[in-house]
Amino acid sequence: MQLLIDAGNTRIKWALTDINHVVGEWHAMGNVVHADLGKVKQAWSALKIERVLISNVAGDAVAWQLRKILVELNVPDASLTWFRAQAECAGVRNAYAQPTQLGSDRFASLIGARHRYVGQRLLVVTCGTATTIDALEADGTFIGGMILPGLATMATSLAVNTALLPSVDKADRARVFADNTHDAIISGCLSAQVGAIMYAYEQRTDPHARCVLSGGAAQYLGPYLPMPFDAVDNLVLLGLDASVRGDAY
């Protein structure tokens, strides 16, 4: 059994999978915020972990904590792999000027989207602490993308003071022309996010291009998008799982 870990900027997500089963078929899964990372030890202690694959964009401190927990669970270093972007993996060709500079989470998301929608032109949008918008060609070539502050990050940066700290969980009730500062911040941030996604989608110049939406803020942005899209949960974990299978699909 293989433990897949997506260590993001805000949360740590994980899933247990069997490489002999269908990609994305989880035997167990969960997620915690960084402050609660120690709690995964109890959950993982009940699992039969033979190998571990980690995508980490959360920094060295989180990497150290993860390794410490795995050592305490008697998982040998030889069984641990840190997933990183490369020139090519699992049907995705990375056209970044320096392929290894692409974030491991973005690369895994592209692999996950490619696996789910093989042979289709895609716009892969992940909505978390940052919003990333990446273009994937039908042949699996990642041609590039854009990064902007995520919905909550953008809203927080515009807060006038703590009393007006915007709550993005009310984004589904936002009006374009708000009659108060709190809602005006939410409206502006939503418009910026949706506008970036729409602009990127228009640049694909293909009516058959598919928009794939993932991440915690996807539920708030989706209702405002004018184009069809598919919401896919845990795209990074799906990509990590697919990467283990190589080019088999």
Predicted regions and their residues:
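Adenine-nucleotide phosphate-binding core of ATP-dependent small-molecule kinases
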Residues: R173-R210, A217-Y220, P228-F229
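Glycine-rich phosphate-binding/hydrolytic loop that grips phosphoryl groups
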Residues: F229-Y249
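Nucleotide and nucleotide-moiety/phosphate-recognizing core
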Residues: Q42, W64-Q65, V71, P76-L80, ...
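Short glycine-aspartate micro-motif
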Residues: Q2-D6, L53, L122-T126, V212
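Short glycine-rich phosphate-binding loop at a beta-alpha junction
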Residues: K48-A58, S79-F83, P207-G216
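Phosphate-binding/catalytic loop of phosphoryl-transfer enzymes
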Residues: W82, A87, G91-N161, L190-A200
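Phosphate/pyrophosphate-binding loops at sites that engage ATP/ADP/AMP, CoA/4′-phosphopantetheine
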Residues: D36-R51, L73-N74, I197-R210
